[in-house]
Amino acid sequence: MVEPYSQKEQVQQVVYRILDANLDRAREGLRIIEEWCRFGLNNAQLALECKRLRQELAKWHTPELRAARDTPGDPGTELTHPQEEERASIKSVLQANFCRVEEALRVLEEYSKLYQPNIAKACKQMRYQVYTLESNLMGHQRHQLLWRSRLYLVTSPSENLLNNVEAALKGGLTLLQYRDKTADDSLRLEQARKLRQLCHIYGALFIVNDRVDLALAVDADGVHLGQQDMPIAIARQLLGSQRLIGLSTTNKEEMQAAIAEGVDYIGVGPVYETPTKVGKAATGLEYVSYAAKNCSIPWFAIGGIDANNINDAIDAGAKRVAVVRSLMQAEQPTLVTQYLLSQLNRIKPEL
């Protein structure tokens, strides 16, 4: 006759089930992340780090813990949430699985103290390693998308702001900057949050003009600064290494200084006179040609560029352009976006 479990043994079995479930959860989440590092990013280093963490967890997944598994009797198998039914983008898939891994490691850390305290210590350190992995991967994602982006929309105040931006995103836009120098902070915060959500849905980068605090408040992908704004070093200290920092430049000296200061991309212009930059003389296509030969980081020709003159900028060496009025004032932003991208995509990709 099999003796019933004592109360202590019953608690032990529950702990074993918790450890078993969370080891599975952590390993599964890491495998999902690893697959994107391997096939989506072609990044062997990040994929190898995921694999190392998975193998470390596997060492602790003993037959003793597996034997405690009771899937038919687990009420959690019936629990779900609408947000788990679909994901808006690769970014949301990755974020959800990083959360899954981090939460599982925290559970393992606490309950392992009742099983093997050495595992608890290891899980604590692994959780910090996963935080670092998340930061590095998201930063890599941002930089990779920045390099792939050809068209950059800088917004201007508009009653149709959200509709125009979404129309451009539908046309293939992958990089957006929110710029409004006249609105009060409450409106800026509201609009920035909505734009950031749109970019999240469409898998585009979201940059905030000038305001590092606003960029952090809405979890933007970065900030774009002017020559008279916050020093790059301070902005980097506040934003960290994984978010993007762009800088406007008007001549080769400013370009070289920006590269030396470690910005992620620059604006080159204004190529033509534009009401967006009142009082600034156009740099012309000469500066575009100089940038094409001398700039080692992503750069965007900007200032008065539209469907009528984009090919002049391309002929001068531009592979990426930033626009304002040509999309914000377009009757059909989706079609204009598609046309501009069709011209830019004829250029040979950078190696």
UniProtKB/Swiss-Prot annotation:
Residues that, per the record, bind Mg(2+): 210, 229
One GO location term (cellular component): cytoplasm
N-terminal signal peptide: none
Cofactor: Mg(2+)
Cofactor note: Binds 1 Mg(2+) ion per subunit.
Positions of 2-[(2R,5Z)-2-carboxy-4-methylthiazol-5(2H)-ylidene]ethyl phosphate binding: 274-276, 304
EC number assigned by the record: 2.5.1.3
A molecular-function term among this protein's GO annotations: magnesium ion binding
Region Thiamine-phosphate synthase, residue ranges: 130-351
GO biological process: thiamine biosynthetic process; thiamine diphosphate biosynthetic process
Family: Belongs to the thiamine-phosphate synthase family.
PANTHER family recorded: THIAMINE-PHOSPHATE PYROPHOSPHORYLASE (PTHR20857), THIAMINE-PHOSPHATE SYNTHASE (PTHR20857:SF15)
Protein name, UniProt field: Thiamine-phosphate synthase
Gene designation per UniProt: thiE
